């Protein structure tokens, strides 16, 4: 019927937060540049949607992808406009400063995960075949005590 009802926001908009601009740094873009692009995406693409649109982010709390991510898995855009610090009325420069303030270093595993996401990996059957190997208790003990 042409009415927007939901948006899948990936790692751009979380419940209570937005994504990290430092995890996708390219050679020609700084984290400030990427934070500015985040501001533009939020203001020009997401925030103009109706307040009753349901926001479904890629994931919630428990990851290092945001500073104030909620445990909730969905919310209305209208409520996020009221409660999410990143959707408040601030200038682009203020937004960038807020977003970059207090960001923790990227998790150690991030580069490997990003490479896997970009390049792909073997089939699930192959992962099971090569990754599920029984260990004798002695072998496990040696691995733990290294």
Question: How would you label these PLM feature ranges?
Answer:
Residues 82-83, 87-146:
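Flexible, polar/low-complexity N-terminal or interdomain linker segments that lie immediately upstream
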Residues 1-108:
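Metallo-beta-lactamase
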């Amino acid at each position: 019927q042409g009415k927007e009802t939901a948006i899948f926001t990936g790692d751009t908009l979380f419940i209570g937060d937005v994504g990290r601009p430092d995890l996708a740094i390219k050679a020609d873009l700084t984290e400030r540049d990427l934070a500015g692009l985040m501001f533009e995406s939020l203001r020009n693409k997401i925030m103009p949607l109706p307040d009753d649109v349901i926001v479904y982010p890629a994931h919630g709390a428990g990851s290092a992808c945001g500073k104030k991510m909620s445990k909730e898995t969905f919310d209305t855009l209208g409520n996020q406009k009221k409660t999410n610090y990143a959707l408040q009325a601030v200038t682009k420069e203020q937004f960038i400063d807020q977003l970059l303030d207090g960001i923790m270093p990227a998790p150690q595993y991030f580069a490997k995960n990003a490479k896997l996401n970009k390049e792909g990996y073997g089939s699930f059957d192959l992962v099971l075949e090569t990754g599920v190997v029984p260990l004798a208790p002695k072998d496990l003990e040696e691995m733990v005590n290294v």
